[in-house]
């Protein structure tokens, strides 16, 4: 599934409303098999290329349908949980819906466990301040993020939950080095806080 201004991260939960006929058919097939499908962001920079129809970004995420409610009008509401980053290798076919070939991508630590833990803890503190100032639900998300000890999982859930700019989210999704991802997120949160407190 290729969606504009969207980046799903591993471990993150994304609600989706399925209404297009092609995606209704895809969902029927997915629910009848392994409940897995990929979500790729629409690469707007490539959208104007000749013969480019909904070009996906190179890095996407495979997710699993955790819950699905079918509506009387044929639409569905579902909750998709990201499982792993993938590289979009090719588009296999478009009809009746897009199917892509993917290759699983793995993150690398990029630094020692101790260095990543220090950065994760400092980032958790900054995000906690940011989310406490945010709208409803911020305190709960901040409390949840404080319980996530693994720097890789933390960086993914934090990026999905805190970052509002889809282009920045996509760059974070494409960053396989966990230390670098944490640093990018740290810089983003710091910059946002400076703007808030001006």
Task: Annotate the PLM regions.
Residues 1-198:
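N-terminal low-complexity, acidic/polar interaction/targeting segments
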């Amino acid at each position: 599934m290729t969606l504009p201004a969207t980046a799903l991260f591993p471990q993150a939960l994304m609600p989706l409303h399925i209404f297009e006929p092609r995606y209704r058919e895809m969902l029927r097939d997915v629910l009848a098999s392994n409940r897995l499908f990929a979500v790729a962001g629409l690469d707007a920079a490539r959208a104007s290329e000749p013969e480019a129809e909904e070009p996906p970004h190179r890095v996407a995420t495979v997710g699993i349908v955790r819950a699905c409610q079918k509506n009387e009008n044929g639409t569905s509401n579902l909750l998709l949980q990201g499982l792993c980053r993938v590289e979009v290798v090719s588009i296999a076919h478009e009809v009746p819906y897009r199917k892509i070939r993917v290759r699983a991508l793995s993150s690398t630590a990029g630094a020692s466990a101790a260095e990543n833990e220090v950065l994760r803890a400092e980032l958790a503190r900054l995000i906690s301040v940011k989310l406490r100032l945010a709208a409803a639900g911020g305190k709960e998300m901040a409390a949840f993020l404080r319980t996530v000890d693994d720097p890789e999982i933390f960086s993914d859930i934090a990026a999905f939950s805190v970052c509002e700019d889809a282009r920045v989210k996509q760059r974070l999704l494409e960053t396989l080095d966990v230390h670098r991802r944490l640093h990018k997120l740290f810089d983003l949160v710091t910059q946002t806080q400076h703007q808030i407190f001006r």
